[in-house]
Design a protein with these regions (language model features):
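Flexible, acidic/Gly-rich N-terminal and inter-domain linker regions that tether
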Residues: 1-58
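Conserved Radical SAM active-site core
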Residues: 55-66, 70-127
Protein backbone atom coordinates (compact mmCIF):
# COMPACT_ATOMS: atom_id res chain seq x y z
CA UNK A 1 0.00 0.00 0.00
CA UNK A 2 2.91 2.35 -0.57
CA UNK A 3 0.81 4.38 -3.00
CA UNK A 4 -1.03 5.86 0.04
CA UNK A 5 0.52 8.61 2.16
CA UNK A 6 2.37 7.37 5.25
CA UNK A 7 -0.03 9.09 7.69
CA UNK A 8 -3.03 7.43 6.01
CA UNK A 9 -1.31 4.02 6.14
CA UNK A 10 -0.63 4.56 9.84
CA UNK A 11 -4.25 5.56 10.49
CA UNK A 12 -5.57 2.54 8.58
CA UNK A 13 -3.27 0.23 10.53
CA UNK A 14 -4.39 1.71 13.84
CA UNK A 15 -8.13 1.89 13.11
CA UNK A 16 -9.09 -0.77 10.58
CA UNK A 17 -9.19 -4.53 10.72
CA UNK A 18 -9.06 -6.44 7.46
CA UNK A 19 -9.87 -10.09 7.86
CA UNK A 20 -11.28 -12.89 5.77
CA UNK A 21 -13.49 -15.74 6.84
CA UNK A 22 -11.44 -18.79 7.81
CA UNK A 23 -11.38 -21.65 5.31
CA UNK A 24 -12.50 -24.80 7.16
CA UNK A 25 -12.92 -27.37 4.38
CA UNK A 26 -12.70 -27.54 0.61
CA UNK A 27 -14.28 -30.20 -1.60
CA UNK A 28 -13.44 -30.55 -5.28
CA UNK A 29 -15.71 -32.38 -7.74
CA UNK A 30 -14.14 -35.32 -9.64
CA UNK A 31 -14.01 -33.28 -12.87
CA UNK A 32 -12.21 -30.45 -11.03
CA UNK A 33 -14.64 -27.81 -12.31
CA UNK A 34 -16.59 -27.26 -9.10
CA UNK A 35 -15.28 -26.48 -5.62
CA UNK A 36 -17.27 -26.10 -2.41
CA UNK A 37 -15.84 -24.43 0.66
CA UNK A 38 -17.01 -24.15 4.23
CA UNK A 39 -15.89 -20.90 5.84
CA UNK A 40 -16.09 -19.68 9.42
CA UNK A 41 -16.80 -16.09 10.39
CA UNK A 42 -15.25 -14.31 13.38
CA UNK A 43 -18.22 -15.33 15.58
CA UNK A 44 -17.71 -19.03 14.64
CA UNK A 45 -20.81 -19.12 12.42
CA UNK A 46 -20.27 -21.06 9.19
CA UNK A 47 -21.54 -20.85 5.62
CA UNK A 48 -20.78 -22.57 2.33
CA UNK A 49 -19.79 -21.07 -1.02
CA UNK A 50 -19.27 -22.74 -4.40
CA UNK A 51 -16.92 -21.99 -7.30
CA UNK A 52 -17.93 -23.20 -10.76
CA UNK A 53 -15.67 -23.17 -13.79
CA UNK A 54 -17.76 -22.07 -16.76
CA UNK A 55 -16.83 -21.74 -20.44
CA UNK A 56 -16.51 -17.96 -19.90
CA UNK A 57 -14.54 -18.11 -16.64
CA UNK A 58 -15.16 -18.63 -12.95
CA UNK A 59 -18.49 -18.04 -11.23
CA UNK A 60 -18.91 -17.97 -7.44
CA UNK A 61 -22.12 -18.76 -5.57
CA UNK A 62 -22.09 -17.00 -2.18
CA UNK A 63 -24.24 -17.13 0.93
CA UNK A 64 -25.93 -13.96 2.21
CA UNK A 65 -27.08 -15.17 5.63
CA UNK A 66 -26.21 -17.71 8.28
CA UNK A 67 -29.26 -19.95 8.15
CA UNK A 68 -32.56 -18.84 6.64
CA UNK A 69 -36.00 -17.79 7.87
CA UNK A 70 -37.94 -18.66 4.70
CA UNK A 71 -38.90 -22.21 5.67
CA UNK A 72 -38.64 -23.78 2.19
CA UNK A 73 -39.13 -27.53 2.70
CA UNK A 74 -36.63 -28.46 -0.03
CA UNK A 75 -33.73 -26.47 1.46
CA UNK A 76 -31.39 -27.51 4.27
CA UNK A 77 -30.42 -23.89 5.01
CA UNK A 78 -33.73 -23.24 6.73
CA UNK A 79 -33.62 -26.19 9.15
CA UNK A 80 -32.02 -24.24 11.99
CA UNK A 81 -33.79 -20.98 11.20
CA UNK A 82 -32.10 -17.66 10.63
CA UNK A 83 -29.09 -16.95 12.80
CA UNK A 84 -28.00 -13.62 11.28
CA UNK A 85 -27.28 -11.61 8.14
CA UNK A 86 -23.76 -11.67 6.75
CA UNK A 87 -21.91 -8.37 6.64
CA UNK A 88 -20.70 -6.83 3.39
CA UNK A 89 -17.15 -7.92 4.24
CA UNK A 90 -18.23 -11.51 4.94
CA UNK A 91 -20.02 -11.75 1.60
CA UNK A 92 -17.04 -10.30 -0.28
CA UNK A 93 -14.69 -12.54 1.72
CA UNK A 94 -16.21 -15.66 0.17
CA UNK A 95 -15.25 -14.38 -3.29
CA UNK A 96 -11.78 -13.28 -2.18
CA UNK A 97 -11.01 -16.75 -0.79
CA UNK A 98 -11.82 -18.37 -4.15
CA UNK A 99 -9.68 -15.80 -5.96
CA UNK A 100 -6.78 -16.72 -3.68
CA UNK A 101 -7.35 -20.47 -4.12
CA UNK A 102 -7.55 -20.36 -7.92
CA UNK A 103 -5.21 -17.42 -8.60
CA UNK A 104 -7.73 -16.55 -11.32
CA UNK A 105 -10.14 -13.68 -11.89
CA UNK A 106 -13.71 -14.31 -10.75
CA UNK A 107 -16.04 -13.38 -13.62
CA UNK A 108 -19.44 -13.50 -11.95
CA UNK A 109 -21.02 -13.78 -8.52
CA UNK A 110 -24.39 -15.38 -7.81
CA UNK A 111 -26.09 -14.84 -4.45
CA UNK A 112 -27.89 -18.14 -3.96
CA UNK A 113 -26.15 -19.96 -1.13
CA UNK A 114 -27.58 -20.02 2.39
CA UNK A 115 -30.17 -17.36 3.13
CA UNK A 116 -32.62 -15.20 1.23
CA UNK A 117 -30.67 -12.34 -0.38
CA UNK A 118 -33.65 -9.98 -0.35
CA UNK A 119 -33.81 -10.25 3.46
CA UNK A 120 -30.23 -8.90 3.57
CA UNK A 121 -30.74 -6.55 0.64
CA UNK A 122 -28.56 -3.61 1.71
CA UNK A 123 -25.48 -5.72 2.49
CA UNK A 124 -25.89 -7.86 -0.65
CA UNK A 125 -26.24 -4.75 -2.81
CA UNK A 126 -23.11 -3.16 -1.32
CA UNK A 127 -21.10 -6.36 -1.69
Amino acid sequence: MTQFPKDLRQWLGDNCVISLPTLITESIAPDGKTRKILVEMSDQSRVEAVLMEQHYGYSVCVSSQVGCAMGCVFCASTQGGLYRDLTVAEIIGQVVIFGALTKEEIHSVVVMGAGEPLQNYDNVLQA
